[in-house]
Amino acid sequence: MDEVDKIIMHQLHQVDAGIEPTDELASFTPELVVRAVSSCLTEIRPELEVPRSLPGGAMAQRFSVATGLAERCKESGYHGDIGYQTFLYPNPIELRRLLMFLIEQLPRERQATDDLTGKSHPLSGREMLQRQIRKKLTAQLKAMWVPQFCRAVGNRKSHGCSSLCIDFRPKLNLNVPSANLEERTKEVQQYFDQQAPNLFQQTASSSYDLIASVLHKNDLERWGQGLTDSGMFLLASEDPVIPMVLATEKPSATAAEMTPLEELTDEVQKLRTQCETLLGERKAYTARIGALKQRESEATKELADIQPLLKLHERTCLVLADPEQNVTKLEALLQATEAKRRTLTQQWQDYRLPLLETLETLKTAKEAQHVQSIRSGIEQLEQELKEKTQQHNDLNTALRTATQSLAPRKEYTRRIHEFIGNIRKQRADIFKVLDDTRQLQKQLNVVGAQLQRQFNYTDDLLFQSAKHDLHAKKAYKLLAQLHANCSELVECVALTGNVTKQIRELEVQIDGEKLKNVLTSLQQITGDIQKFEQSIQELQSQISTMENGVAKA
């Protein structure tokens, strides 16, 4: 099983780089078993959340972690005998079966990628983090989006939203009289006293909210007459809702007279018409102001272009007023400017030559320093090349040694084919033995039936003759005794076969128990039981201390 263990360790190292390869599975500790199984389960089913390590504290936590991993393995399709003892008290045989099953269940995507790249490498911490982020984002993108107010309180909290859920109910334009009594006529006051519904009656419907309606009414009274920059009333688009009068409304005296409500409606209509007229005038004035501003900007730009030309014309006119004197002044100014230029040129040359010499010196020094750095770099590279060459030779030597010491891949393949051939051969031998056993059983049944029929026939003949012949009577007794002895012999042979079968089964079971390291497992179980007893004693001492404290208090 050394080759199988090496293959298992190689696969585990590819799944989790923290699992160092060892020579055999017998050296696996419970912590290493938990880490290997959890890594394989995470690769097989990424949505599972399994513990990556075994707690080192209380035994109850260790038992719960081991039991959870055993259940996850059963959910993944493992049908073997598995429980918490598989992880806390591992034996090489059961552990080899479990790890071989998990390795067979690993996804083939990683193996295909390794085959394409020509090499296999364990997952680094960065790759594992990227894989977890990719899985998390994929799960979130596949999940259905639900608005915040449609989620439950716990769901909203888990998504970082507020746990408050406020039902939306629209506002209502309340019909409330003005607080100034002087602004209300007698008819309006009579209407609000007798016919108009109160606030609670206006917001009695479940679709309106009283507080929102009152706030809306206050905003209307405060900002209703103001205009926005776009020339629209702030709340003019909302038509006031005229509530229905109650059943106690009295009919008007005459149809020709207008009710206060109709007068208010007529006044509102007039104000609305006047407002629309004012808005149209305002739009016209705004357009006219924009055109005037455009003309002003064009005139300002044209003025800025004309001012330099005007200054030039003014200076030209001043020169042409006295041409001879102005030409003499210009010639004198040119001569003075030329002399000043020559002086400045001489001063610049005197200042420039030392700077050029200094610049050449600095360039030469810099080039020399650069050449020196290049030489030192070349020497360093030569030294590194020698070291790399020596390292390459050493690695080639180690590779040849390792290639000679380790069996190649073909050798592993050949051994696997040999194992498969031996298994097939054993299977064929088993089937052959079973067929021979069935044929022998058939022959035994046929011979037994023939003997039974022969005995019955002989028994009938001797029984008929025994009535008249003494020798026939003795022969009948001997026949009955022979039949009884033969039956006892057959039963003895059957019992011997059953005992032999049970002996072989017990021998196989004994060999299996020897391989499971029962003594080591019993020692570990004894240690765990002692830890349990110690923790129970500590709890009992704490309970007694608390009881004494309570009794004293």
Curated annotation (Swiss-Prot):
One of its GO terms (molecular function) is cullin family protein binding. Residues 261-404, 498-553 form a coiled coil. One of its GO terms (biological process) is positive regulation of ubiquitin-dependent protein catabolic process. The keyword Coiled coil applies. Keywords: Coiled coil. InterPro entries: CCDC22, CCDC22_CC, CCDC22_N. Belongs to the CCDC22 family. This is Coiled-coil domain-containing protein 22 homolog.
